[in-house]
UniProtKB/Swiss-Prot annotation:
Full protein name: Flagellar basal-body rod protein FlgF
GO CC field: bacterial-type flagellum; bacterial-type flagellum basal body
Record family assignment: Belongs to the flagella basal body rod proteins family.
SS bond partners: none
Compartments (UniProt record): Bacterial flagellum basal body
PROSITE patterns: FLAGELLA_BB_ROD
Family matches, as InterPro entries: Flag_bb_rod_N, Flagellar_basal_body_rod_CS, Flagellar_FlgE/F/G, Flg_bb/hook_C_dom, FlgE/F/G-like, LlgE_F_G-like_D1
GO biological processes: bacterial-type flagellum-dependent swarming motility
Upper classification of the organism: Bacteria, Pseudomonadati, Pseudomonadota, Gammaproteobacteria, Enterobacterales
Length: 251
């Protein structure tokens, strides 16, 4: 088989992977705090006894785009937005801590605070508020509750959000969509980040996704055309080999 087929096949495979990343970004264009996944392709020279005239294509995923999203003022007390390097802490399915910029906090049936189904972690563990109470969140993450029918002066703190600070190159997205520390960051800062009292939040505000839908749609069209071109290359090479075999059989 001609080596050109392997080259085009590898490029087509990586184009499909790039299309999957683009589709995932587009699907999360309305997810609060979402960070677009970056994807790139690079050429890898093929080493061997012959001349270095061919290259293969491999994916290079540098991480996520940490550009802040647009702030949307919702006036909802449980919506919070963080500083650029701030992260909310939630409990992942495996019990470990995960980090997110999604500040759309919900109250579960038992009063537990959650974000996308993950329990919100406070400085003492998962946070639970009294059922039916009016919740407010201060700039330092302190959560206060006012029970129904009680006078305003009886509002009392029930917990405090665990707010941590991590730069974009210190975290990476996991398969569950949550961010976790990279191996290098864990070696330097430990397996679990400590709460950072300098982080401040804004209540009643949500940070939107930093995905640009128009650009994502354009990328999807470009990926589709690139894949089609690579399929044509494979077809052309296969047809040329077929004609060459016919000529050899006639001689």
């Amino acid at each position: 088989m001609d080596h050109a087929i392997y080259t085009a096949m590898g490029a087509a495979s990586q184009t499909l992977n790039q299309q999957a990343v683009t589709a995932s970004n587009l699907a999360n264009a309305s997810t609060p705090g979402f960070r677009a996944q970056l994807n790139a392709l690079r050429a890898v020279p093929v080493d061997g006894l012959s001349l270095a005239t061919r290259t293969l294509v491999t994916a290079s995923t540098p991480g996520a785009d940490m550009t802040p999203g647009q702030l949307d003022y919702t006036s909802r007390p449980l919506d919070v937005a963080l500083q650029q390097d701030g992260w909310l802490v939630v409990q992942a399915a495996d019990g470990a801590e995960g980090y997110t910029r999604n500040g759309n906090i919900q109250v579960g049936p038992t009063g537990q605070l959650t974000i996308q189904g993950h329990p919100v972690i406070g400085e003492g563990g998962p946070i639970t508020v009294p059922e039916g109470s009016e919740i407010t969140i201060a700039a330092d993450g302190t959560i206060s509750a006012l029970n129904p029918g009680d006078p305003p002066n009886t509002v009392a703190p029930v917990g405090r959000l665990k707010l941590v600070k991590a730069e974009g190159n210190e975290v990476q997205r996991s398969d569950d969509g949550l961010f976790r520390l990279t191996a290098e960051a864990q070696a330097e800062r430990g397996a679990v980040l400590a709460a950072d009292p300098s982080i401040r939040i804004m209540s009643g505000v949500l940070e939107g996704s930093n995905v640009k839908p128009v650009e994502a749609m354009t990328d999807m069209i470009a990926n589709a055309r690139r894949f089609e071109m690579q399929m044509k290359v494979i077809t052309s090479v296969d047809e040329n080999e077929g004609r060459a075999n016919q000529l050899l059989s006639m001689s």
